[in-house]
Amino acid sequence: MKNFLKNTLFLLFLTLIIINRPKVTYAILEGIKLWKNSVFPSVFPLMILSDFALSTSIINVISNTIGKPFSKIFKLSKQSSYVFLLSTLSGSPTNAKYIKDLLSHQYIEKKEAEKLLAMTYLYNPILILNISSFLPVKIGIYLIVTNILINIIIGIINRNNKINYTPIIKLEPQKFSLVESINKALNVSMLILGSIITFIALISLIPIKHPLISGIFEITNGITSLKSYDFTLKYNLIFISIMLSFGGLSIITQIKSIFINDKLNYSLFYKSRIIHLILFILISLIYLKCFL
């Protein structure tokens, strides 16, 4: 039965793609353009910097500087503070890459990776400013700050989820290879491109056109499409809050692909997205009422 459904869905999508080939082709080209202009420039350099950071003492510096209060507040190991700090700059799915690096080198365990993933669902600040450029700059700054704040709140809410870890006083720097780092960064970048193209192509086949529906599949496309509609600032902010909370199937697929061999439990991650959604909408409504 399962195979029958898979085959039926495959034939259905294949038929739709053939029938709507010009529309799908246009959507794919738009996806490539979006990735080239907004995603790749903000993600690729930071992934290489992340690899380079593992070859230096920067993780130890960060862990020794903010690791102790971070560990006490969130009940995570000190080295997890490095992931949170870098995630505020690079966002998702790069946060998964940082967590994967620590997990692969056995600096953290699987349970801690799950807990850390739930509270680092952030976005590259430059990317947010780019895709929300049709709105006032203060809205973009509000979105960046609020999203970081909500992830901190989620970390506090989840702090009592017990994990076992051995505190590491000093992490040994890893050997850095620029060629290997570029190769890994390109692989993740291509994964992101493939996800964006796939979901934007699927969106083009859906007869109902609405930014929220687009955002459910692919967030950057969903937010940028808002400028084509005559929504008020209030509705734009609420719609963006919803999309940033969920992140879109594209980003979730990318994150799961990075951890494909680690068999993480995503229940805490999904629960945290619901909390994220509720908090983001409530804070946005308060912000609209008090400041706009």
Regions found by a protein language model. Give the residues of each.
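Transmembrane helical segments that form the transport core of multi-pass membrane transport proteins
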Residues: 56-58, 178, 182-244, 248
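Selected transmembrane alpha-helices and immediately adjacent juxtamembrane segments
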Residues: 8-23, 28-40, 44-48, 52, ...
